[in-house]
């Protein structure tokens, strides 16, 4: 479930209410359905209960003065039932929320704080995150927001087991051992705040520090990535890679054969075919430079590193960068999403030389940055080659940090319960038959899970197309998210037609080679009016993958999962 509001950053599923199945002083009917929504084995009472919260840039100092409910914004969640202060039991997961999602390429990050309640706190672990179901089974008001009721004296008396407050908990994300906590805003004011780590002091290198910190969370994990090889989380020194990359770019630019090749550039808009031809020749010339010797070795053994792939990728990235409508995130995402297997092209994924990963990464980024800088004038305006290359280095390093972190999360079994749909290298399916049914005739929420993986090469997930009926069946933007090997990633949703909403991940998402994704789609019904099949524009949800060319037109690979409308 999506969180966010003021300093929260990662989305934390919100819900956990109920634990005290014993119902001290409460009538039997109050807990009649508690077993269906409360996990008593994971509920507990603790003195001086602590958890961790990730805060965005600009809020590290203010949050240490105390927790306050923001006067505007989402106040922790888009859904009124789940507005609250979010935290987690894992400080490394909390760190992942310290990046400003609206400006992810700034390089900045906030920090992590440890928050602690005085006295006794009851943690109620929930089995489900559907607020309507929880309120119904717990005998709560169906019209009052869930988290507001959690903070009432009546609720605390019924479910607190003598504690001063009740905090709800849910799994942090599918496949994760971490949990998230949802705190009532008024109760959260009692939290004492202690700084755990501050990334703001690193300025534009704050995200580097954040990823270095997060790498500690998986230092002991051995993740099976391909036959015959396994890796723990690789803690690459991105400062060193950045410096190495820029040094290599300077050396490459001044090398005679490369300099001559650069002078042969058309330096004006040309056809896509001619641009690719020139870039492929540039790639071949550059690989003869000693600074790219490791990369040349890899290129000779893995066809995905071939010059034609680099050239096609560079042209596509340049086209996106040249677009006046593409925002920063779209521009950088293009670097990894345009070409299938681009992770391998850049020297990160399986198949690359692992004994010298740092050097391979630096060489890959140096060559890629130069090629993109060369490609931009071929598809759009003239730019300074050095400036464009260095700018792209920063973008690609930030993006790789995100992707690399996702790759190195522990894998989990996708657990398909329906027949997967195979297309363009992807495998997509509903998690259960029930997920494929959209029920109407009631007011409230529903969640639907989709499993996504790839057969071999890592492939990108560009987004999802969701049919809607404005005012009757809308997308709950705060709860729609995608989880990659246990790590939740927010999605940015917008209406592209009156009856279609497009949601795309706010960070690059890849599946394949042991990496699986769970797409959680949430719908909201503001009316109890029944919906008929002929009212909705489409009877399928479209999962979008990599770009390909069909009849000279670029389109995304699309996998359609059909659903039923039932009342």
Swiss-Prot record:
| Acyltransferase listed as a keyword | no
| Site residues by UniProt (Modification inactivates enzyme) | 185
A GO cellular-component term linked to this record: extracellular region
Q: Which GO terms describe its molecular function?
A: identical protein binding; NAD+-diphthamide ADP-ribosyltransferase activity; nucleotidyltransferase activity; protein transmembrane transporter activity; toxin activity
Q: Which reaction does it catalyse?
A: diphthamide-[translation elongation factor 2] + NAD(+) = N-(ADP-D-ribosyl)diphthamide-[translation elongation factor 2] + nicotinamide + H(+)
Q: Which Gene3D superfamilies match?
A: Diphtheria Toxin, domain 1, Diphtheria toxin, receptor-binding domain, Diphtheria toxin, translocation domain
Modification note: Proteolytic activation by host furin cleaves the protein in two parts, Diphtheria toxin fragment A and Diphtheria toxin fragment B; which remain associated via a disulfide bond.
Q: List the disulfide bonds.
A: 218-233, 493-503
Task: Specify the domain of life of the species encoding this protein.
Answer: Viruses
- Tell me the residue numbers annotated for binding NAD(+): 53, 97
Question: One matching Pfam family, short form?
Answer: Diphtheria_T
* Signal sequence residues: 1-32
Active site at 180
Site feature: Cleavage: 225-226
Give the record's free-text account of how this protein's activity is regulated: Partially inhibited by 1,8-naphthalimide (NAP).
> Quaternary state and partners of this protein?
Homodimer.
Q: What does this protein do?
A: Diphtheria toxin, produced by a phage infecting Corynebacterium diphtheriae, is a proenzyme that, after activation, catalyzes the covalent attachment of the ADP ribose moiety of NAD to eukaryotic elongation factor 2 (eEF-2). Fragment A is the catalytic portion responsible for enzymatic ADP-ribosylation of elongation factor 2, while fragment B is responsible for binding of toxin to cell receptors and entry of fragment A.
Task: Report what the protein is called.
Answer: Diphtheria toxin
Q: Please give the organism.
A: Corynephage beta
């Amino acid at each position: 479930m999506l969180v966010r509001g003021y300093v929260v950053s990662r989305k934390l599923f919100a819900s956990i209410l109920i634990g005290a199945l014993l119902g001290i002083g409460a009538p039997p009917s109050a807990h009649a359905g508690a077993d269906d929504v409360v996990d008593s084995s994971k509920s507990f009472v603790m003195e001086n209960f602590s958890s961790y919260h990730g805060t965005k840039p600009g809020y590290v100092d203010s949050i240490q003065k105390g927790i306050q409910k923001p006067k505007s914004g989402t106040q922790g969640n888009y859904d009124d039932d789940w507005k609250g202060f979010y935290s987690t039991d894992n400080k490394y997961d909390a760190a992942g929320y310290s990046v400003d999602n609206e400006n992810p390429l700034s390089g900045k990050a906030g920090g992590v704080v440890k928050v602690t309640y005085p006295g006794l706190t009851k943690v109620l672990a929930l089995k489900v995150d559907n607020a309507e179901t929880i309120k119904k089974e717990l005998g709560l008001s169906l019209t009052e927001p869930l988290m507001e009721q959690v903070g009432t004296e009546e609720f605390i008396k019924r479910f607190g087991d003598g504690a001063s407050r009740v905090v709800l908990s849910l799994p942090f994300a599918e496949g994760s051992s971490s949990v998230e906590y949802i705190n009532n805003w008024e109760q959260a004011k009692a939290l004492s705040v202690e700084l755990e780590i501050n990334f703001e002091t690193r300025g534009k290198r704050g995200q580097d520090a954040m990823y270095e910190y997060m790498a500690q969370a998986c230092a002991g994990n051995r993740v099976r990535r391909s036959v015959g090889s396994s890796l723990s989380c690789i803690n690459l020194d991105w400062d060193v890679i950045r410096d190495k990359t820029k040094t290599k770019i300077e050396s490459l630019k001044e090398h005679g054969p490369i300099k001559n090749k650069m002078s042969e550039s058309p330096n004006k808009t040309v056809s896509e075919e001619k641009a690719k031809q020139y870039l492929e020749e540039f790639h071949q010339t550059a690989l003869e430079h000693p600074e790219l010797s490791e990369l040349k070795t890899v290129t000779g053994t893995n066809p995905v590193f071939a010059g034609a792939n680099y050239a096609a990728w560079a042209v596509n990235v340049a086209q996106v960068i040249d677009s006046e409508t593409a925002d920063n995130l779209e521009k950088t995402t293009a670097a990894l999403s345009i070409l299938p297997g681009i992770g391998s092209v850049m020297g990160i994924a399986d198949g690359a030389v692992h004994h010298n990963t740092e050097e391979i990464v630096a060489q890959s980024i140096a060559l890629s940055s130069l090629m993109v800088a060369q490609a931009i004038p071929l598809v759009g305006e003239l730019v300074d080659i050095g400036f464009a290359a260095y700018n792209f280095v920063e973008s690609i390093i930030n993006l790789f940090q995100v992707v690399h972190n996702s790759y190195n999360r522990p894998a989990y079994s996708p657990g398909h319960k329906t027949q997967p749909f195979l297309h363009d290298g992807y495998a997509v399916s509903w998690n259960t038959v029930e997920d494929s049914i959209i029920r109407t005739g009631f007011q409230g929420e529903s969640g639907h899970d989709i499993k996504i993986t790839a057969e071999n090469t890592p492939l990108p997930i560009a987004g999802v197309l969701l049919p809607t009926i404005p005012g009757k069946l809308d997308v709950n933007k705060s709860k729609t998210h995608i989880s990659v090997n246990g790590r939740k990633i927010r999605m940015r949703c917008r209406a592209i037609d009156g009856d279609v909403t497009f949601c795309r991940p706010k960070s690059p998402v890849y599946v394949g080679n042991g990496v699986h994704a769970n797409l959680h789609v949430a719908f909201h019904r503001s009316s109890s009016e029944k919906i008929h099949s002929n009212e909705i524009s489409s009877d399928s949800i479209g999962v979008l993958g990599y770009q390909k060319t069909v009849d000279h037109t670029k389109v995304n690979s699309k996998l359609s999962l059909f659903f039923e409308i039932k009342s």
